[in-house]
Amino acid sequence: MMPHQLSLVVGLGNPGSKYDGTRHNIGFMALERLARREGFSFRQQAKLHGLSADKGFGDQRLRLLMPQTFMNDSGRSVRAALDWYGFQPEEIVLLVDDMDLPLGRLRLRAQGSAGGHNGLRSTIQHLGTQVFPRLRIGIGAPAENPAERRARTVSHVLGPFSRAEQPCVDAVLDAVLDGLDRLKTQGMERAGTWINGFRYESPSAT
């Protein structure tokens, strides 16, 4: 069992209060939950184009980053952080929303394409590589209607979770934190097995 060298966790989203709690910002939500649990304090870092926080864990130091560049330019902030701290792409993990995954599911990958995600696309462009870990957080897809697909997609990802969905969202965010703990201590393969097998089950279904 080989632990993973995790130096930087990046949550992707859009800055500004009007985007708080939206599906596209679930990466921010996960990072904020991690910060609350571990006692991190974010501060604006102009040189990183984002909000950052760091804290020591034994002889290691973990850093968090929320780009404030808007989703489509997230890679500029990620690139700046890697250059400033001297990290390699393999030492980071991006937390991103995934419309192709149903709400209640997660997927960890060590590398891969953007898969239509603009934040991942920007990061790949700025880093010049697809080889960096990403944890995709399912947000579900809007009801299918080909004639209105684009409009429905935009309103879906920029819309809030419903009250009925909130218990699932809370459980998923807790699972993301659990998955990050496993990634640090158990390594990519074992953590991936647990993360990719996670499924939210409603208490009413048990």
From Swiss-Prot:
It comes from the Bacteria. GO terms for cellular component: cytoplasm. It is found in: Cytoplasm. Its EC number is 3.1.1.29. It catalyses: an N-acyl-L-alpha-aminoacyl-tRNA + H2O = an N-acyl-L-amino acid + a tRNA + H(+). The record marks 97 as: Stabilizes the basic form of H active site to accept a proton. It is an enzyme of class 3 (hydrolase). Keywords: Cytoplasm, Hydrolase, RNA-binding, tRNA-binding. Monomer. Hydrolyzes ribosome-free peptidyl-tRNAs (with 1 or more amino acids incorporated), which drop off the ribosome during protein synthesis, or as a result of ribosome stalling. Belongs to the PTH family. This is Peptidyl-tRNA hydrolase.
